Amino acid sequence: MIRERKKSRHPRLPTLPLAAKASLYLFFACFSGLSLWSFHRDQPCTQNWIGLLGWSFSSFLLYFFGAAAFFIPLYFLWLSFLYFRRTPRPLFFYKAAAFLSLPFCSAILLSMLSPVGTLPALLDTRLPKFILGNNPPVSYVGGIPFYLFYEGQSFCLKHLIGSVGTALIFGFVMLFSVLYLCGGIALLKKKTFQDGVKKAFCSFFQTCFKNLKKLINRRNYLPKPSVPFVSKNPFSCTKSQPSPRRVSETIILDGSISPLPQEEIPGSKKESFFLTPHPCKRFLTKFVEPQENKAKEGKTIALSSTPTVVRESKGKERAALPKLKSLAVPENDLPQYHLLSKNREARPESLQAELERKALILKQTLTSFGIDADLGNICSGPTLAAFEVLPHSGVKVQKIKSLENDIALKLQASSIRIIAPIPGKAAVGIEIPTPFPQAVNFRDLLEDYQKTNRKLQIPLLLGKKANGDNLWADLATMPHLIIAGTTGSGKSVCINTIVMSMIMTTLPSEIKLVIIDPKKVELTGYSQLPHMLSPVITESREVYNALVWLVKEMESRYEILRYLGLRNIQAFNSRTRNKTIEASYDREIRETMPFMVGIIDELSDLLLSSSQDIETPIIRLAQMARAVGIHLILATQRPSREVITGLIKANFPSRISFKVSNKVNSQIIIDEPGAENLMGNGDMLVLLPSVFGTIRAQGAYICDEDINKVIQDLCSRFPTQYVIPSFHAFDDSDSDNSGEKDPLFAQAKTLILQTGNASTTFLQRKLKIGYARAASLIDQLEEARIIGPSEGAKPRQILIQNPLEG
């Protein structure tokens, strides 16, 4: 009843259909246009096409609006066009005001700037004479507004702000109206446009400052004569002092400096003249070798332009410019992020509205299941969006966790991840894929790292977290890393990102890499890097030798630290050298120890294909090599218990898991399920020892073209010097010394002869070695005619007797 009364009190007026409104505006446009076009002030009203009504209507419009009245028919025609097309009219009032302000301002500006003689004949004949009496026709162009605002006595802009100020005001009003009608205001509000304007201004001012600095330096470096003289050259500009000429920066050194011929020397013949030394001599002396003063008159120096000639007394000789060295690039000049390509993807403006809509759906879903909760922060990363849910008191966290599939259904998400609770917060986190995913460009991470003061020892620029923050890690504190993921999940791209992080932030003298690539195509492009300890290892028989060499290097470094009384590599590199103590050591002690990083791709394939036990040196390095700066990065497609054994897992606290096949593999690699629900293409879970729980992030991407650019740039800056050209030599020397037998061969032989059991699993259990090494020992015992060949399910026959029994 109340609603009906309200409706009856305020009845709605009937509205005209759109076609009727369009026709009405079209009629007004034709009426005003024909009446204005046929108006003539010297002709009677009967000559007007619309008659007396049209003549009076035109006089009224021209009297009040001046020349701007001719835009009124266009305004009605624009309205008719909008109604005919049924175009939506947001902010119609403001657009109409902007449309009408254009002719109004233009008429006033025309009245101010146009003299009487240059008025168009069309306007001069159509403006009424009785408007302002004997005033010149230029006043009529603006109509009454021009007379009131500019020429009148009550409010005269001409005397208040002058003609320039008036033109400035109305000109800016016209510019603002044009921008508003064309959508320029919305363009100005966009962040991309603002950033572009900022960059343009910054680059402009930087260019100005650089040019100003060059000009100042040019003036400072201009050579000045030590003694002024009078030139006899008739073509010289002044008689008292020669005009200084700019000396080119290009120098061709042929030897010492010689005096000019006597015929060309102005002044006395008893005086000698020498060329002014190059103005950048102070800079050049940093990169030149000192040379003995053996200047003779026969040698000359050539400059690219004519230098200033100065006079010196006889007997005084100026030292010749020394010979230039090959300018070496400073070691601290590393490749910058400018080499890499930019990320051209722009985040759409509708992302925030879409996330708010998702948040509303999430809250409604929780309410429908009887969960009272509020929503906290909404964070958006490159591929993920994270919502914070603040449950009320009495709500069980496990109840929210059990609604994972229902929430994914309501949000129409391919997969979600619920963090119950968020570590350090009284909230539950829900991560869903963002509706507008973006790739994480490695250039952005490198640019942020190079612009910050935070410097890591072995930086790993991995990607961006779910909230959009950068994910950086220091391998020196991790201290080893395992990367697992199926084919196409982003594992190989992550390895490339890790290698690029190290080579673009550290010098070749600070870090050395040992890369093992059984696939022979993924990482072989890094062989020419100056950071490499050896070329990329692709043969499985070299892998064991490389790992054994790293173990020996680890033991050698520990011996040096023990001798010097130091605890780790950081103390060694920052020590004060005592050359007397270090010289008494039996081997040479270097000034610094570089970090060494071993990167092994496809660990599972190596464990199956290698005949030697590579698990033992890996475990030894993982247990002991941290203090001496040797670190390992392992990658595998199959994170099963046969590959990632208990000893490996215990010594690799830092792990990265991309999408895996099942929950069991996820449990093995990150100690919790969830990796099987990842989206792939760089979506990863990172487990760090310094952080409680896992971190979800999007891995960075770098293309092959950028990798090749960086490698070429590094090779041009630093020479490639391998410490070990190949590990084949180690294999040959070991085979010559040991007779191609395992060090445990004698122990395995004694054990088999004593027990009478010759099986691979028996040796693996008793000697505590891996399966591959135990199988290799069985093969060596068979070749030595100690045991017989395999006979299927039957045990092997022992061919010799135990010497103790005999």
From Swiss-Prot:
Domain FtsK as annotated: residue spans: 468-667
Membrane topology qualifier: Multi-pass membrane protein
Membrane-spanning intervals of the chain: 16-36, 64-84, 96-116, 130-150, 168-188
Cytoplasmic face residues: 189-806
Molecular functions (GO terms): ATP binding; DNA binding
UniProt GO cellular component terms: plasma membrane
Principal localisation: membrane
InterPro entries with a match to the protein in the record: FtsK/SpoIIIE/SftA, FtsK_4TM, FtsK_alpha, FtsK_dom, Ftsk_gamma, P-loop_NTPase, WH-like_DNA-bd_sf, WH_DNA-bd_sf
SMART domains: Ftsk_gamma
Superkingdom, natural source: Bacteria
Biological processes annotated in GO: cell division; chromosome segregation
Sequence positions that bind ATP: G488, S489, G490, K491, S492, V493
Induction: During infection of human HEp-2 cells, it is strongly down-regulated by IFN-gamma cytokine.
Compartments it resides in: Cell inner membrane
Gene3D superfamilies to which the protein is assigned, alphabetical: 3.30.980.40, P-loop containing nucleotide triphosphate hydrolases, Winged helix-like DNA-binding domain superfamily/Winged helix DNA-binding domain
Any Pfam family matching the protein: FtsK_4TM
Recorded domain comment: Consists of an N-terminal domain, which is sufficient for the localization to the septal ring and is required for cell division, followed by a linker domain, and a C-terminal domain, which forms the translocation motor involved in chromosome segregation. The C-terminal domain can be further subdivided into alpha, beta and gamma subdomains. The alpha and beta subdomains form the DNA pump, and the gamma subdomain is a regulatory subdomain.
Protein family membership: Belongs to the FtsK/SpoIIIE/SftA family.
Known role: Essential cell division protein that coordinates cell division and chromosome segregation. The N-terminus is involved in assembly of the cell-division machinery. The C-terminus functions as a DNA motor that moves dsDNA in an ATP-dependent manner towards the dif recombination site, which is located within the replication terminus region. Required for activation of the Xer recombinase, allowing activation of chromosome unlinking by recombination.
Oligomeric and partner information: Homohexamer. Forms a ring that surrounds DNA.
Protein name stated in the entry: DNA translocase FtsK
Organism: Chlamydia pneumoniae (Chlamydophila pneumoniae)
